[in-house]
Amino acid sequence: DRNLNQMRSVAVYYKEYSSIENLQLLGENYIKQMKRDLTPLTFQTSILCQRIGIAKDGFYSSMREGHKYNASDFEFLDEKFKSGEWSAESGEAFTCDADSDVNKDAPICIGMDYNANINWIVAGQPDGRRLNVIKSFYVKFERKIPEVVADFCTYYASHRNKTVVYYYDATALGSNYAVNEQDFRWVVVHEFERHGWTVEAVYLGNPMRHDEKYLLINQGFAGKQRLMPFFNRQNNDDLILAIQAAGVSRGRNGFRKDKGGEKLAESEED
């Protein structure tokens, strides 16, 4: 018993629980709100406590932990908290001033994904042979392209070079299911300009075939392309989850990224 008690004195009990098991304290409305606000994968990990690792046979199988990095400007954060400008109770959102990987004198490159239920902006800057994915944004349901652009502009309000290099392909032309009248490209450019940003629009043509995209991306992760992608861990947790969980499906035209999970209907009432 003495030996057992000695081991117990330095032991730590660790167990992971789903938030559903704490439903009585959290309340049903909290769970519903989290399901509405978070991406499906983030809801699975942060609320349901399900572990999602990098799929070894997935679409982005060459991604490794080394492709993630931390870039918090702790000197800036310490100064803000010590001065009382920021506090845990203030609820004030962080901005790009808290990021140490942003070159404020260089343009920000962006790519976007347009969907009826969720719209994304992924922002990056090249740094030598690195492509640093510095931040990603998403909006869901009634919040569409104007809102995700506004979120971007708010976060990067102190960025000195207010230029975005907007890469888009044919999917941004002639489609408007995420907006009212104009196509995606027009709305993106219009919204950035309305917020005082300059847009350098770069048309990429038709979308790449999935097998070509797979080869390009995984060669990039392996350092065999001009740029190797790296992800700011704190600013891309939802994006990293999506990348790690992306699978591969095979059909008559070869393999492709499995978008089965992306196609599942998700309503505001779910």
Indicate residue ranges for each PLM-predicted region.
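Signature of the SF2 helicase/ATPase Hel1-core->accessory helical subdomain module
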Residues: 1-21
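Short boundary motifs at domain starts and secondary-structure transition points
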Residues: 4-6, 95-102, 155-158
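Hydrophobic/aromatic beta-strand patches that form the interior of the parallel beta-sheet core
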Residues: 13-16, 110, 167
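ATPase catalytic-site recognition across NTP-hydrolyzing enzymes
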Residues: 19-110
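A short acidic Gly-Thr/Ser loop motif
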Residues: 112-117
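Short beta-strand scaffold segments in enzyme catalytic cores
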Residues: 119-125
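Mg2+-dependent endonuclease catalytic cores in nucleic-acid-processing enzymes, primarily RNase H-like
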Residues: 130-263
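Short, intrinsically disordered, charge-balanced linker/junction segments flanking boundaries
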Residues: 267-270
